[in-house]
């Protein structure tokens, strides 16, 4: 299997979730072994995709370099991971990736419009070689060895619409588009009101998030009955992309979020619990077929 980029540049305009201002997003092809790099065109600063450049994980995954940041990268990175893209320049003219409809489907459509280009160099996978786990009370996130890529997530909210939800996702690009990409981010009305009081979530609305009061959702409907846990998987895929490539293994979590996911990527690297592998022949392994 070869490294991938996109065939041609593609652009979109949306608003940032927290500042509520317009953001122009542009994806550009890059050569093999370039990796994925964010570029703030308004500041002239590049930020490589790496756990070492994560600067905040409270409300979203935020990366930064030289005091310049790009926030809410996880939905875009989730879609990029799903297509197995290794080399890409991501240009934004503000400090947030646009939220679009709160899911990853707009980014999936951008990538499909741009097309996938295979390069000459072999694709490098991050193969998990031993179990790594991060805990915080009853919350946890772990990566385990497996010959395939899978995500197993459970959440438990004291809310009549959410409650306990579990989802086991066997990864492939096709499955991602059908099962995960359309799942939207969600938040509680009382939290949104507080965030706005401190100047955050100014771009949030029923157009780009599921909003819940104490008893129900305020949106017209859900896209999936278990849309909440599916979105947590969408986020986890985006957060795991900060490893710098597609991993081979199983991700399992209970009530994890951006912070635990980030600590998990850092711990995996610290323990050297992985090896870099390449598959020279297409279809040689089940994991290569997942990206076909």
Curated annotation (Swiss-Prot):
Cellular component terms (Gene Ontology): membrane
Swiss-Prot/TrEMBL catalytic activity: a UDP-3-O-[(3R)-3-hydroxyacyl]-N-acetyl-alpha-D-glucosamine + H2O = a UDP-3-O-[(3R)-3-hydroxyacyl]-alpha-D-glucosamine + acetate
GO terms of molecular function: metal ion binding; UDP-3-O-acyl-N-acetylglucosamine deacetylase activity
Gene Ontology annotations of biological process type: lipid A biosynthetic process
Entries under InterPro entries matching the protein: Ribosomal_Su5_D2-typ_SF, UDP-acyl_GlcNac_deAcase, UDP-acyl_GlcNac_deAcase_C, UDP-acyl_N-AcGlcN_deAcase_N
UniProt binding sites for Zn(2+): 75, 231, 235
This protein's pathway: Glycolipid biosynthesis; lipid IV(A) biosynthesis; lipid IV(A) from (3R)-3-hydroxytetradecanoyl-[acyl-carrier-protein] and UDP-N-acetyl-alpha-D-glucosamine: step 2/6
Cofactor(s) it depends on: Zn(2+)
Enzyme Commission number(s) from the entry: 3.5.1.108
Keyword annotations of the record: Hydrolase, Lipid A biosynthesis, Lipid biosynthesis, Lipid metabolism, Metal-binding, Zinc
Residues forming the catalytic site: 258 (proton donor)
HAMAP family according to UniProt: LpxC (MF_00388)
Known function: Catalyzes the hydrolysis of UDP-3-O-myristoyl-N-acetylglucosamine to form UDP-3-O-myristoylglucosamine and acetate, the committed step in lipid A biosynthesis.
NCBIfam families associated with the record: lpxC
Protein name: UDP-3-O-acyl-N-acetylglucosamine deacetylase
Species of the source: Nautilia profundicola (strain ATCC BAA-1463 / DSM 18972 / AmH)
């Amino acid at each position: 299997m070869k490294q991938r980029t996109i065939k041609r540049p593609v652009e979109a305009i949306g608003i940032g979730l927290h500042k509520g201002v317009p953001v122009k997003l542009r994806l550009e092809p890059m050569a093999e072994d370039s990796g994925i790099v964010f570029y703030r065109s308004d500041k002239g600063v590049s930020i490589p995709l790496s756990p070492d450049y994560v600067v905040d994980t409270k409300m979203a995954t935020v990366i930064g370099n030289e005091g310049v940041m790009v926030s809410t990268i996880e939905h875009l990175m989730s879609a990029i991971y799903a297509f197995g893209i290794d080399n890409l320049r991501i240009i934004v003219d503000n400090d947030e990736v646009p939220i679009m409809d709160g899911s990853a489907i707009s980014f999936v459509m951008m990538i499909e419009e741009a097309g996938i280009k295979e390069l000459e160099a072999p694709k490098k996978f991050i193969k998990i070689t031993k179990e790594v786990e991060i805990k915080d009370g009853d919350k946890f996130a772990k990566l385990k060895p497996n010959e395939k890529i899978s995500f197993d997530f459970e959440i438990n909210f004291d809310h009549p619409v959410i409650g306990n939800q579990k989802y086991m996702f066997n990864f492939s690009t096709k499955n991602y588009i059908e099962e995960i990409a359309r799942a939207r981010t969600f938040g509680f009305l009382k939290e949104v009101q507080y965030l706005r009081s401190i100047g955050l979530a100014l771009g949030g609305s029923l157009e780009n998030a599921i909003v819940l009061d104490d008893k129900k959702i305020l949106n017209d409907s859900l896209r999936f009955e278990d849309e909440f846990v599916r979105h947590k998987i969408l986020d986890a895929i985006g957060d795991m992309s900060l490893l710098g490539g597609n991993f081979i293994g199983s991700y399992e979590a209970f009530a994890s979020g951006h912070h635990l996911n980030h600590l998990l990527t850092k711990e995996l690297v610290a323990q050297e619990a992985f090896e870099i592998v390449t598959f020279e022949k297409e279809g040689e392994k089940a994991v290569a077929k997942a990206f076909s």
